[in-house]
Swiss-Prot record:
Pfam family membership, one: Methyltr_RsmB-F
GO biological process entries: rRNA base methylation
Any one GO molecular-function label of the UniProt entry: RNA binding
Chain sites annotated for binding S-adenosyl-L-methionine: A125, A126, A127, P128, G129, S130, K131, E149, D176, D194
Protein name: Ribosomal RNA small subunit methyltransferase F
Taxonomic classification: Bacteria, Pseudomonadati, Pseudomonadota, Gammaproteobacteria, Enterobacterales
Organism per entry: Klebsiella pneumoniae subsp. pneumoniae (strain ATCC 700721 / MGH 78578)
Domain of life according to the entry: Bacteria
Stated role: Specifically methylates the cytosine at position 1407 (m5C1407) of 16S rRNA.
Catalytic class of the enzyme: transferase
Keywords: Cytoplasm, Methyltransferase, RNA-binding, rRNA processing, S-adenosyl-L-methionine, Transferase
Length: 477
C-alpha cells in the first residue's frame, strides 16, 4: 500500500517530540503516521460466536490477525476488496460483524476490565455506534444502554447500526452531553465518554486531519472535555466505572483532563490502572496507569484511555430547568401483553423478561426494563425496538424486531441464491415453501427478515433503504 502524505504542523511535531516516551522513537512515530491504516473488524457475538464466524469465513481467504485487547476483534486483509467492498458483504449486512478501528475497541475493553455486568450504562458520544454495539454485545443485550449523540445528522446512522446488529437494550437521546449530570444524577453503573477531540491520532485515516490544528484549539477542546467529564461523573453512581477516551495524543486533552477531575473531587475519584488489560499493554502505559497509544506501538490509530472509579457520592448539580413533557407511551396490561407475546411467538419472535411491552397509538414497542427508571427524566429520540403496528387483521411485525428477536431454529433457511435475491429486494421462489403464512427467513442461520407466503412465492419485506445491488458474497455460489 502507498504511503500517505500527512500534513504535520511544526508546532504539533514539537509537541509530540516533547511528549514521546523515552522507549519510543520519534522517527518510528512519523513513519507509522505515514502508513495507511490497517482495516479491522469486530465479530458481533450477539449473532455468532467468534469460532463459528472464523469457520464461516475460512473459505473466503480472508487473512485475520487477532486484536490483542478484544477477543472479538481482528485486523483483516482481503484479496477481493476491490470486487466486493467489506461493507457490502452479506455477513456485514446481516450484522455478523462491525467494521471498527482496532484502537477504538480499547475503551469498551477497559470498561469491562473487571468482567462485571453493569445493569445500566451510558455512552455519552455514541455515533456511529461502534462502541455502543460493542457494549451491547458485552452485556449480551441484557440491562440497558443510554446512547447519546449530540449531532442530529448522526443519530440516524447510530440507530441503523444498532438495528443491523440486532440490539434491543438501547435508548437513544440527542443532547449536549453536559446535561446528564444534572438530569440523571448518580444513575449509571458504567459510563463511556469517548470525548470529542482534536483527532491527532487519526492521521493514518485522514491525511488532512491536522489542517486546522493549533495549540489554542487544543485548549478550547480541553475546556469542553472537562465540562463533559464533570457531567458524566455526576451521572455515575458511587462504585461505578467511568472510562474516558480520545483519539488524540496531546496531554491537555488527555492526562490533564483526568488531573482536573481528580483535583475537583479528590475524595471521590480512583484511577484504575490498565497495565494488565491485555498482554503488551505495558508498552502504552503511563506513570498514572492510563493507556497512551502512539500509532507505532500496535500499528493502529493513536488513542488515549483512562479508567476511573467513583468511590463516593458528590454534591448534586442544580436540577435542570427544562420540562420533559408527558411520556407518550403506556405499558400494556397483562392480558394485552400476553396476547401480543403469543402472536409474536407464533411467527418466531421471542424475548426475555428484561423487555416490556409499551404502546403509542397503533405502535407496539419493546423497551429495556433497566431503563424504565429514566422515563420522564429526559426526552428520548427512540427507545428499544419497535415490535409491530396494529391493523385490522392483527399485527404488522417490524423488520428491526425480526432482526433482534427472531428464533432462528423456527425460521426458514434460504439458499445463497435465494438470500441474494432477498437482499436485492426481490421475492423468493423456494423449491419447497414453508407451511405458515408468515415466516422468518434466515441465511447462515441469521435472520434476514419476515416473508409472507403467497402460493409458492415468499413475498419480500426487506426495507427499501437496505436493498443492495451488486456482488454480495465472498464465497462461490
Amino acid at each position: 500500500m502507498a504511503e500517505n502524505t500527512v500534513y504535520f504542523p511544526e508546532a504539533f511535531l514539537a509537541q509530540m517530540r516533547a511528549a514521546m516516551p523515552a522507549h519510543l522513537s520519534f522517527d518510528d512515530f512519523i513513519a507509522a503516521c505515514q502508513r495507511p491504516l490497517r482495516r479491522s473488524i469486530r465479530v458481533n457475538t450477539l449473532k455468532i460466536s467468534v469460532d463459528d464466524f472464523l469457520s464461516l469465513v475460512a473459505p473466503y481467504g480472508w487473512q485475520l490477525a487477532p486484536v490483542p485487547w478484544c477477543a472479538e476483534g481482528f485486523w483483516i486483509e482481503r484479496e477481493d476488496d476491490d470486487a466486493l467492498p467489506l461493507g457490502s458483504t452479506a455477513e456485514h449486512l446481516s450484522g455478523l460483524f462491525y467494521i471498527q478501528e482496532a484502537s477504538s475497541m480499547l475503551p469498551v475493553a477497559a470498561l469491562f476490565a473487571d468482567n462485571r455486568q453493569p445493569e445500566r450504562v451510558m455512552d455519552v458520544a455514541a455515533a456511529p455506534g461502534s462502541k455502543t454495539t460493542q457494549i451491547a454485545a458485552r452485556m449480551g443485550n441484557a440491562g440497558g444502554i443510554l446512547a447519546n449523540e449530540f449531532s442530529a445528522s448522526r443519530v440516524k446512522v447510530l440507530h441503523a447500526n444498532i438495528s443491523r446488529c440486532g440490539i434491543s437494550n438501547v435508548a437513544l437521546t440527542h443532547f449536549d452531553g453536559r446535561v446528564f449530570g444534572a438530569a440523571l444524577p448518580e444513575t449509571f453503573d458504567a459510563i463511556l465518554l469517548d470525548a470529542p477531540c482534536s483527532g491527532e491520532g487519526v492521521v493514518r485515516k485522514d491525511a488532512d486531519a491536522l489542517k486546522n490544528w493549533s495549540p489554542e484549539s487544543n485548549l478550547d477542546i480541553a475546556a469542553t472535555q472537562r465540562e463533559l467529564i464533570d457531567s458524566a461523573f455526576h451521572a455515575l453512581r458511587p462504585g461505578g466505572t467511568l472510562v474516558y477516551s480520545t483519539c488524540t495524543l496531546n496531554r491537555e486533552e488527555n492526562q490533564s483532563v483526568i488531573e482536573w477531575l481528580l483535583s475537583r473531587y479528590p475524595q471521590a475519584v480512583e484511577i484504575l490502572p490498565l497495565g494488565e488489560l491485555f498482554p503488551g499493554a505495558a508498552d502504552a502505559l503511563t506513570a498514572e496507569g492510563f493507556l497512551h497509544v502512539f500509532p507505532q506501538i500496535y500499528d493502529c490509530e493513536g488513542f488515549f484511555v483512562a479508567r476511573l472509579r467513583k468511590t463516593a457520592a458528590i454534591d448534586p448539580l442544580p436540577a435542570p430547568g427544562y420540562k420533559v413533557g408527558k411520556f407518550p407511551f403506556t405499558p400494556l396490561k397483562d392480558r394485552e401483553a400476553a396476547a401480543v407475546t403469543a402472536a409474536a411467538r407464533a411467527v418466531g419472535l421471542e424475548w426475555d423478561a428484561g423487555h416490556t411491552l409499551w404502546q403509542r397509538d397503533k405502535e407496539l414497542w419493546l423497551f429495556p426494563l433497566a431503563l424504565e427508571p429514566l422515563f420522564g427524566k429526559v426526552r428520548f429520540s427512540r427507545i428499544g425496538v419497535r415490535l409491530a403496528e396494529l391493523h385490522n387483521k392483527g399485527y404488522r411485525w417490524q423488520h428491526e424486531a425480526v432482526i433482534a428477536f427472531a428464533a432462528p431454529q423456527r425460521a426458514f433457511e434460504l439458499s445463497q441464491e435465494e438470500a441474494e435475491e432477498w437482499y436485492r429486494g426481490r421475492d423468493v421462489y423456494p423449491q419447497t415453501a414453508p407451511g405458515q403464512d408468515e415466516t422468518i427467513v434466515t441465511f447462515q442461520g441469521v435472520p434476514l427478515g419476515l416473508a409472507k407466503r403467497v402460493g409458492s412465492r415468499l413475498k419480500n419485506s426487506y426495507p427499501r433503504e437496505l436493498v443492495r445491488d451488486g456482488k454480495l458474497f465472498a464465497g462461490k455460489v
